[in-house]
Amino acid sequence: MMTPTELITHYRIVQHSFAPLRLSWWETNRVIAVQIWRDSSFFTRILIAFIGLCLLSIFSRLTRPRSLRRLGIPGAVQPRFSTWSLDFKKVLEDSAKKYPNSPFCLNAFGTEYAVLPSKCYDEVKRLPEHQASAFAFFREAFHGAWTGAGVQTPELGRTIAVELTRGIPSLVHWRQMDCAEAFKMCIGEPSEWREIQLFEAIQRIVISVNSSSFVGRELGTNQNWLRLIYNMPLQLGIPTVILGWTPFLLQPLLKPFLFAPLRMTQRKIKSMLRPVLENDVQEYEASSDKKNLLSPKEQGKVQLTGWLLSRYKGKLDFEVLLQDFITVLFESTPSTASTLFHVVCELAADPALQDMLRQELEEHTDNGSLPQTHLNELRKMDSVMRESARASPFSYLVLYRKLSIPTKLSMGPELPAGTNICVDAHHINTSPDLWDQPHTFDGLRHYRARQQPQNENRYKFANLGSDAPSWGDGLQACPGRMFADNTIKIILTHLLLNYDVKLRPGESKPEKGAMPNGSIVPDVWAKVLFRSRASSAVNEGKK
């Protein structure tokens, strides 16, 4: 058995022996380490491993970013029980009550945030991107170098905000047909009440409808394609959670393994996308009338490839184009599906609300066909959507930003560069100063507000403002909110005109959970009952 003194002596002897070979420092120490390990006893090996882990832990602690608490920012009020059963809403409410005029620290999955009170919403939204960047935050929090999260070119953002928004109305009828195909795949046409696992069905419908618009109906109805897009959020989220509990120094060693499934999925998506985009590029380059080619069409998919090519102006890398499409397909799914899930839950719990929206649809559709507009005519449906987003938002926190320069806000100390900040949205959505009975779902709340002449263009689902925090705000607000608005209305229209939906007997609306970073988690296992209105009517007629 070798003692520590003998180890040091052995190291010096071997080092002296290898001196004539002129090995590098790394090569010499690698050979010595292998030799010492081979000659050591079991006890000595355990001791070496223990010392190594201790040194690694100390180094990791010394090199990790310093906590914001050193600036005097207090920590969030934490419950006594495990964070695995964390009631984040209570954490936020208790912390806001204790620190009404101060930011507080929150650490979730290895990322530390300074959570600012809701009264700071307008101040934070005005911070320019070069000072406080949303994309920089998401790149860091979701390991963008490995996952592609938070990677969006300015050209893509402008294309979504301008050309896509302009092209939505002309495709309404075609998207209704895309939606019908999606429902046929995911729900079927049950003549009797059928249990449907709601979140999975909604997610697949959203993926299919959006994919048909971006890459064509052939891929949008391809089961393998749907599975790949469906898996991406899980393959991003689960490794992110694991890395949050991993020592900082070990994370680079684990990332290649943890994100391997996501990277494999992205490679498969790219291989399926490549022929579609190559066709688009050839069509764009061969066209002599690009203005006509890129104008809104009433059939097929949107001209996303052509719009991007016109903005990149010949400097496009095909891999960048592929990544742009993956970004669009990924970012257009989770928040839209979550919002739609909660709206359907409200409808399932209230048959009278379903009938009211069906009556509105009868007034604004022609044999089931919606007008080729942005669908602002559907005011009651819009109100239900906005109220659902208020009562069941995508996250309790909004305006996530990473500071690139030291920043002094109206409250709290100066925050150093590299600080992650966000704003408490929960106390906007539940503010009694903004909303009457804020803890009650009122589907027509915003419809009634818009009856006032001065509110004609306010209180819409896709509007920005300090009373509608879900989209973010300012120049870094979600550029695809009009597309999401259109998608949800088309899907709800098909559902209401073709299906009845209700909760299972004796059940109430599915409960919501929350992650330690404030994200609201729908009950992904919840089941509701669907029945085809046409099939059930036929059966009733036969009786």
Curated annotation (Swiss-Prot):
List of residues binding heme: C478
Primary localization: membrane
InterPro entries: Cyt_P450, Cyt_P450_sf
Protein EC: 1.-.-.-
A GO BP annotation: secondary metabolic process
Domain of life of the native organism: Eukaryota
GO molecular function, one term: monooxygenase activity
Transmembrane segments: 40-60
Residues carrying sugar: N210, N367, N517
Biochemical pathway: Secondary metabolite biosynthesis
Keywords: Glycoprotein, Heme, Iron, Membrane, Metal-binding, Monooxygenase, Oxidoreductase, Transmembrane, Transmembrane helix
GO cellular component: membrane
Induction: Expressed exclusively during fungal penetration of host leaves, the time point at which plant defense reactions are triggered.
Protein name: Cytochrome P450 monooxygenase CYP1
Source organism per UniProt: Pyricularia oryzae (strain 70-15 / ATCC MYA-4617 / FGSC 8958) (Rice blast fungus)
